[in-house]
């Protein structure tokens, strides 16, 4: 066979793979690539008779191309996380969910887990919720969870489907946790009667729910909580009033910035800086009418305690207790990063304006008066933190009552020689052991309240012990580190770490004693 015949055969074979219609005039030019000359990058040598009318050289053409303004092809830089339209990925929306394809069942399960994870609850509760929904739908699932994402593998009748869900940010929303608990109870009772679209409509209602409180209400809640926190740390009326102003302004700014969709650390640093400055301005104002008010500078620490990440700190410990190491370590890292950033900003502002974390002056109250005030301030503090976590008023009040009992007990055990003098004790209980007992009591009381009030246990336990997180110790450790006082830094840091470690241990023991689902590994 000669060369001409071989070329003819090759052309016939290529024509068989031509996917374009020869009669389509719009696509004619696409079938054959244009020659390199058409891109005008290769310069032909000009004729001698053209002289100065010859085209510019190749180098000048390249220079002109490089000097042009950048071309835009309709691609815009958007958010790092795209929103999923769950209704668009459903293939059998009007079919009963139990009879739907595996992909539709996976969308229901993953959307349920996404809403739970976005609410700030721990990995065990997210997995448990997804497992219970999967059980209703007749699917076996395996879930690997982290702070902002999870991977879910669904198995049914020899088929396997894998799905990954990612969140743009994290936060705490106890009202949404409560709504998801109600959704779960509804599903376990009537779930086999719902279609795929009905599942997604219920989940859409939960997802589209607005926060219960405006930024100014969040600021007021932080003001009340931090003012009460300052009293529990040993502060007096002047420190409480200034912390009220500082925390209110700081958390209002922080909530407003977060509402605009900006980053958490931008909101955090702005809120802490404004809280410290507002505390000083309030102190200067009081100094005009109250002699000696400027000597009460140490309360500025209380004005910034609204940023202490109590929820991720506690849930990190609970995740680690259930061997959800990936989620636990990520939550712990997130909490530590917030603490470090907040304390560094607080230290920087304190250095600029001349504030220092000194000890509070004794209040001189009797044991009975101090105990009663601790009960009231513990309730106010826990109630305020619960509102910051978006708890409804009744839920926040229930958490406040639990915190009033457990936190007052903790403080009384630490100050036992002065609070209970008739026992004749020489020393009080170590703060670490008292924190364990306080968390244990909170967990046991929350178990009783969960039965009576149907509130999620975590929405009662965590706010009730957030007030036990040693924010003062954490700040002082970072303050002394920045001033290169290593001895004091290590002392306050070790104290803070031990107390923080014992808080989730106490909750875990209470959960083990009262919840069989938590008690077992499977």
Residue ranges, per PLM feature:
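Core alpha-helical transmembrane segments of integral membrane proteins
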Residues: 211-316, 386-389, 393
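Short juxtamembrane and helix-loop transition motifs at transmembrane-helix boundaries
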Residues: 197-210, 223-235, 254-262, 353-367, ...
């Amino acid at each position: 066979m000669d060369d001409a015949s071989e070329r003819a055969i090759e052309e016939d074979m290529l024509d068989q793979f031509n996917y374009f219609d020869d009669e389509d005039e719009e696509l004619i030019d696409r079938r054959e690539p244009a020659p390199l000359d058409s891109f005008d990058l290769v310069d032909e040598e000009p004729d001698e008779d053209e002289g100065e009318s010859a085209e510019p050289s190749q180098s000048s053409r390249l220079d002109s191309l490089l000097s042009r303004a950048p071309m835009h092809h309709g691609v815009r830089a958007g958010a790092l996380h795209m929103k999923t339209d769950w209704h668009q990925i459903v293939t059998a929306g009007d079919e009963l969910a139990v009879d739907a394809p595996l992909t539709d069942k996976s969308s229901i399960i993953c959307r349920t887990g996404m809403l739970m994870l976005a609410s700030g609850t721990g990995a065990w509760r997210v997995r448990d919720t997804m497992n219970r929904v999967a059980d209703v739908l007749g699917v076996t699932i395996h879930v690997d969870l982290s702070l902002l994402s999870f991977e879910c593998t669904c198995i049914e009748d020899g088929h396997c489907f894998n799905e990954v869900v990612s969140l743009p940010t994290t936060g705490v929303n106890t009202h949404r946790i409560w709504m998801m608990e109600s959704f779960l109870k509804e599903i376990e009772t009537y779930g086999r009667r719902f279609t795929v679209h009905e599942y997604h409509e219920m989940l859409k209602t939960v997802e589209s729910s607005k926060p219960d409180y405006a930024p100014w209400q969040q600021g007021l809640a932080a003001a009340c909580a931090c003012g009460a926190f300052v009293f529990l740390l040993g502060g007096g009326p002047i420190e409480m009033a200034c912390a009220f102003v500082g925390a209110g302004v700081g958390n209002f700014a922080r909530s407003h910035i977060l509402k605009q969709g900006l980053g958490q650390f931008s909101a955090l640093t702005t809120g802490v800086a404004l809280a410290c400055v507002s505390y000083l301005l309030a102190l200067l104002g009081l100094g005009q009418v109250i002699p000696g008010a400027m000597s009460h500078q140490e309360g500025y620490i209380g004005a910034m305690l609204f940023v202490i990440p109590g929820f991720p700190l506690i849930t990190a410990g609970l995740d680690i207790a259930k061997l959800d190491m990936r989620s636990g370590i990520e939550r712990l890292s997130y909490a530590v990063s917030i603490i470090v950033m907040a304390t560094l900003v607080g230290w920087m502002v304190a250095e600029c304006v001349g504030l220092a974390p000194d000890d509070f002056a004794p209040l001189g109250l009797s044991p009975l008066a101090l105990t009663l005030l601790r009960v009231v301030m513990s309730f106010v503090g826990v109630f305020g933190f619960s509102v910051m976590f978006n708890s409804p008023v009744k839920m926040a009040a229930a958490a406040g009552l639990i915190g009033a009992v457990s936190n007052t007990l903790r403080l009384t055990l630490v100050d036992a020689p002065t609070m209970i003098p008739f026992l004749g004790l020489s020393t009080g209980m170590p703060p670490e052991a008292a924190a364990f007992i306080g968390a244990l009591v909170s967990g046991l009381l929350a178990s009783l309240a969960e039965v009576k009030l149907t509130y999620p246990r975590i929405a009662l336990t965590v706010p009730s012990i957030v007030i036990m997180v040693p924010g003062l110790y954490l700040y002082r450790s970072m303050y002394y580190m920045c001033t290169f006082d290593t001895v004091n830094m290590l002392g306050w840091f070790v104290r803070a770490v031990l107390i923080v470690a014992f808080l989730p241990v106490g909750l875990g023991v209470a959960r083990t004693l009262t919840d069989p689902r938590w008690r077992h590994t499977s």
